[in-house]
């Protein structure tokens, strides 16, 4: 067995009455842990290699804590706490970044992104949806939907209320980790698996999906869809949209460069370069016909928006008299043609 791992984490989670995992909380996930740490815990777990999620007892957690005491004080302290748990425990070991095979593995990878250890698109998330059970997220934690009605009745009989906040595959990120230096006005609008960079403010209408996020700093008042990453200093106006990779059958990865502004109720279906502005209310899809204007507001040519993908210093607007979508630049006609040909 190799003493190297891609990732390792000790977790505490929730199971249904059949013993199936509903969710797992990893307080301190590790990316590429030290070989000596792996060598110390492998014999105690009976781990021989591969990607595995191994359920452990509190006694085993105490043994692991002792083994790690001279090697990693933080993980030793965590395991000491886990040894007192009244909830199911699991150790998840990923030898490689391969397709997912279990719910604890899926939760570990979502944690790695939200802990800012890996950026969106940096992990293999193949097979994640079948491995994330659709559960009721309540004031008493995750509840299997098949057990929800009985749990609600039990609560009422005790004079309590089991409040259901959402029914979804993904929990909100802040129930698992709150990254340093961020503001999130409505925590339900940021899913676990979001990467929220330092200096990011997510206002009430903002939303960040899993495997998506922001470099920060920036203001998010619109939707950062799955797969989308927003560069530093960029702002998304109220109600604006970024087209994700999960809907519409598109395979273009949408990104927003640095210093961009997407206006309120606007949207993009192409990746933006740096210092781009999209006028409020204007939705640009890849096939949108755009009149390209030079530095003197003269028409250079009509192109599809996809031909401008990734270009910097562009202003997208709609002509209020003709309705034509225009792209204004600070470049001459010659420079624009050269840029377009270079892109092709």
Explain the meaning of each model-derived region.
Residues 152-204, 208-209, 213-215:
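Glycine-rich adenosyl-nucleotide cofactor-binding module
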């Amino acid at each position: 067995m190799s003493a190297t791992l891609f990732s390792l984490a000790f977790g505490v989670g929730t199971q249904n009455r059949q013993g199936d995992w509903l969710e797992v909380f990893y307080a301190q996930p590790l990316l590429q842990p030290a070989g000596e740490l792996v060598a110390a815990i492998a014999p105690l777990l009976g781990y021989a290699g591969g990607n595995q999620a191994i359920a452990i007892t509190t006694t085993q957690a105490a043994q692991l804590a002792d083994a790690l005491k001279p090697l990693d004080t933080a993980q030793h302290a965590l395991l000491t706490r886990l040894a007192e748990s009244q909830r199911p425990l699991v150790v998840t070991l990923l030898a490689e970044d391969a397709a997912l095979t279990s719910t604890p593995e899926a939760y570990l990878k979502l944690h790695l992104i939200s802990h800012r250890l890996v950026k969106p698109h940096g992990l293999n998330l193949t097979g994640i949806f079948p491995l994330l059970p659709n559960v009721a997220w309540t004031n008493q934690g995750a509840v299997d939907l098949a057990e929800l009605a009985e749990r609600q009745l039990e609560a009422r009989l005790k004079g309590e209320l089991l409040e259901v906040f959402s029914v979804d595959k993904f929990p909100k990120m802040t129930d698992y980790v709150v990254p340093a230096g961020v503001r999130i006005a409505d925590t339900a609008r940021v899913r676990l698996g979001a990467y929220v960079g330092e200096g990011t403010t997510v206002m009430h209408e903002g939303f960040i999906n899993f495997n998506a996020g922001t470099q920060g700093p920036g203001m998010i008042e619109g939707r950062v869809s799955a797969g989308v990453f927003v560069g530093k200093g960029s702002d998304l106006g109220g109600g604006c949209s970024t087209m994700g990779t999960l809907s519409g059958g598109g395979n273009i990865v949408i990104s927003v460069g640095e210093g961009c502004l997407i206006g309120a109720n606007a949207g993009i279906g192409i990746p933006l370069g740096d210092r781009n502005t999209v006028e409020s209310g204007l939705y640009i899809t890849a096939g949108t016909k755009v009149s390209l204007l030079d530095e003197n507001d003269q028409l250079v040519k009509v192109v599809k928006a996809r031909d401008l993908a990734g270009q910097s210093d562009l202003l997208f607007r709609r002509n209020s008299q003709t309705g034509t979508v225009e792209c204004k630049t600070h470049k001459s006609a010659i420079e624009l043609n050269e840029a377009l040909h270079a892109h092709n």
